[in-house]
Amino acid sequence: MKKYLVIGNPIDHSLSPRLHNYWFKENNIKAVYEKKQIRESDIGGIISEMRNGKIDGINVTVPFKKSVIPFLDKMQIPEKTQSVNTIYREKNKVTGSNKIVGRNTDIIGFKNSLGHIKYSIKGKKIFILGAGGVTPSIIYALEEMEPSVIMLCNRTKEKAQKAGLIYTDTQKKINVNKKRNAHNGHRATRRFQSLAKPEK
C-alpha cells in the first residue's frame, strides 16, 4: 500500500487526509494519506524516508514550502516563487535511481479556480490580504493574468516586502504606508505594501 503525507506546523486543522482517503476509496486505490506535524529539523529525515521508498509522496504546507527546497534533487517550479507544495519520486529509466522532485500546484490551482467560474481579472485592481507561504505563487499567477494593480497588505512590512520584491522586474513602484487603528485599547500599526504593474 502506498503512503502519502501532508506536512506542516500546525497541521491538525488539515482536511487533506479526509479528502484524499475518500478519493482513494472511491477509485479503488490501495493507498493511505496521513498528516504529520514536524519541525524544520525533521525535513531531512522525512525526505530520506521518501528516497528509501517508505513514503510515496508529500504535500507541504506552512511554514515549510521554502525550507524543503535544499533537500530536493530537482524542482519544477517558477524559480522566483521559491515555494514547493508537492514532492514526489521520479525514477531514472536508465540508472534506476530515484530523484526527489518538488512542484508547485498553487499556481495552476489558482488559475483553474478563476477559469472555472469564467472570471477575468485583466485590467482589474487586485487586493491580497496576508503574505503567507502561498502569496508569491498567487502573485506569480496574477502577473500572467494582467491586472492593472496588485496591492498586498500584511501586518509586518518586512514579510510583505519579501513576498513582493521577488517581482521587481515587473514593478512600477512600491509604496509603504502606515495606518493606525485602535485595537483592544492599544494603537495598532498596519503597514500596506502596494505593488503595481507598468502601464502598457
Predicted ranges, named:
Residues 2-117:
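Phosphate/diphosphate ligand-binding glycine-rich loop within oxidoreductases
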Residues 3, 32, 125, 148-149:
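Residues at the starts of beta-strands that form the adenosine-phosphate
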Residues 8, 104-107, 114-115, 122-147, ...:
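Glycine-rich adenosine-cofactor-binding loop
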Residues 56, 148, 180-183:
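Conserved acidic residues
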Residues 67, 157-162, 192-195:
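Short, charged/polar "capping" segments at the starts of alpha-helices
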Residues 145-170:
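NAD(P)-binding Rossmann-fold cofactor-contacting core
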Residues 169-200:
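Rossmann-like adenosine-cofactor binding region
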